[in-house]
């Protein structure tokens, strides 16, 4: 089942300024080509790789998925499962679980791997924390994951809105465990402000994804910084030693085993407790191409490597995502639901 690295794929990185993208309008989503055309990089001449047998998504029957979608729309809530085109959406929705995305559906970043829309976001919805808390209570969730788009337009990066959501959930569902998956709060003074605000009502698990190895950041995460993300994770852990920290990395963007192992060592050196490792899947032809499909044996090797480094929980597999079975991941790390 081994698969060689596709070293011959002719990946070319070119300026994203060759085509005039649609103008930004507040609250209007730019997706696919419109989004990536605004990116500092575009990818051309990379052939589409055939998905191997181990990349399979189970689509369950029944009305659970549609019922949950109706409940979300009724409460004007958004899930990252839908906005980011997660391959596990049918499985999670059929079990009544979802990762809620706050602060709107429009991101200020243009990461080449992500299917969330880019644009000029609207101001935060002041009613969202109450709506989210009501939905969590109505669904009877014992564990909830709350994430957001990047909000570089906000002075605190959206930290206060996270706290408002955490507080609202704790009020209506005091026994529910809360994991937040945050942006990097990058910008002058923004990390300081965000950490100060998050300390007012911290979550049970703090998650921020490193996403890829440092050498690939310019192409994969333009606008982000590898060391900044590591520092955010370490500083939160230093302020809250008893709260589990978590991060995630995608494979298949052109990284090597040695680079992935080095990134895992960096995460442990910055006091990250939990790690998720999964296969990158290209959401549209405009996005970063899949350079290689890593094998199940390689994921198992990385799981063993992560355990040897001392992570409290390692979730490593082709279909693993940051919030996929997050409750089980947290339980494996000692966070009781």
Curated annotation (Swiss-Prot):
It comes from Xanthomonas axonopodis pv. citri (strain 306). [4Fe-4S] cluster 1 binds at residues 81, 86, 92, 323. Pathway: Protein modification; protein lipoylation via endogenous pathway; protein N(6)-(lipoyl)lysine from octanoyl-[acyl-carrier-protein]: step 2/2. Pfam families: LIAS_N, Radical_SAM. The keyword Metal-binding applies. Binds 2 [4Fe-4S] clusters per subunit. One cluster is coordinated with 3 cysteines and an exchangeable S-adenosyl-L-methionine. GO terms for molecular function: 4 iron, 4 sulfur cluster binding; lipoate synthase activity; metal ion binding. Its EC number is 2.8.1.8. Residues 93-312 form the Radical SAM core domain. Belongs to the radical SAM superfamily. Lipoyl synthase family. It is found in: Cytoplasm. Keywords: 4Fe-4S, Cytoplasm, Iron, Iron-sulfur, Metal-binding, S-adenosyl-L-methionine, Transferase. PROSITE patterns: RADICAL_SAM. This is Lipoyl synthase. [4Fe-4S] cluster 2 binds at residues 107, 111, 114. One of its GO terms (cellular component) is cytoplasm. It catalyses: [[Fe-S] cluster scaffold protein carrying a second [4Fe-4S](2+) cluster] + N(6)-octanoyl-L-lysyl-[protein] + 2 oxidized [2Fe-2S]-[ferredoxin] + 2 S-adenosyl-L-methionine + 4 H(+) = [[Fe-S] cluster scaffold protein] + N(6)-[(R)-dihydrolipoyl]-L-lysyl-[protein] + 4 Fe(3+) + 2 hydrogen sulfide + 2 5'-deoxyadenosine + 2 L-methionine + 2 reduced [2Fe-2S]-[ferredoxin]. InterPro entries: Aldolase_TIM, Elp3/MiaA/NifB-like_rSAM, LIAS_N, Lipoyl_synth, rSAM. Its cofactor is [4Fe-4S] cluster.
